[in-house]
């Protein structure tokens, strides 16, 4: 349900002329949600909505009146905890609109910038879209590339390669 609500807000923001301003403000606010104290304050029933609104707006340098009204609407509807989800959804819709997709590369070791750029170029050609990849470290020996926006995932494991080579050699004998 929260994802549907966040999509609705994100879609409305994406159609605005001052979209970039909204997006940068939401990115700033989303970073505050990393603090447990901030979340506790927003979840508190003892703190009035107008104080929560004041706190949220105090995190921004000179927000526009339109953005203040947007945050006021969010707080009035008790949806302030959706701000990170709205930001995430807005980021995904923005990427989709610009034909840019974000993905992750999971590997045992962090990949170099050159390796990531090479993968991005090859995947961009394959999907006819701009692909951005983040390198993440995982525990297993496999390499996995995941592009959620495109529904694409590929995994390559040394163990499976060795097993296939053994099978091929045994068939050849």
From Swiss-Prot:
It comes from the Bacteria. Disulfide bonds: none annotated. Keywords: ATP synthesis, Cell inner membrane, Cell membrane, CF(1), Hydrogen ion transport, Ion transport, Membrane, Transport. GO terms for molecular function: proton-transporting ATP synthase activity, rotational mechanism. It is a peripheral membrane protein. It is found in: Cell inner membrane. One of its GO terms (cellular component) is plasma membrane. F(1)F(0) ATP synthase produces ATP from ADP in the presence of a proton or sodium gradient. F-type ATPases consist of two structural domains, F(1) containing the extramembraneous catalytic core and F(0) containing the membrane proton channel, linked together by a central stalk and a peripheral stalk. During catalysis, ATP synthesis in the catalytic domain of F(1) is coupled via a rotary mechanism of the central stalk subunits to proton translocation. This is ATP synthase subunit delta.
């Amino acid at each position: 349900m929260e994802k549907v609500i966040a999509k609705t807000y994100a879609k409305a923001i994406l159609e605005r002329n001052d979209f970039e301003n909204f997006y940068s403000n939401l990115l700033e606010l989303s970073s505050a949600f990393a603090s447990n104290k901030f979340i506790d304050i927003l979840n508190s029933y003892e703190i009035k909505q107008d104080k929560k609104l004041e706190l949220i707006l105090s995190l921004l340098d000179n927000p526009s009146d339109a953005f203040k009204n947007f945050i006021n609407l969010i707080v009035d509807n008790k949806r302030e905890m959706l701000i990170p989800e709205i930001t995430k959804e807005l980021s995904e819709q923005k990427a989709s609109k610009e034909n840019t997709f974000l993905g992750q590369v999971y590997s045992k070791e962090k990949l170099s910038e050159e390796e990531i750029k090479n993968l991005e170029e090859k995947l961009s050609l394959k999907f006819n879209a701009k692909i951005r990849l983040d390198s993440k470290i995982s525990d297993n020996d496999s390499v996995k590339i995941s592009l959620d926006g495109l529904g694409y995932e590929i995994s390559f494991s040394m163990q499976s390669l060795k097993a296939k080579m053994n099978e091929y050699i045994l068939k050849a004998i």
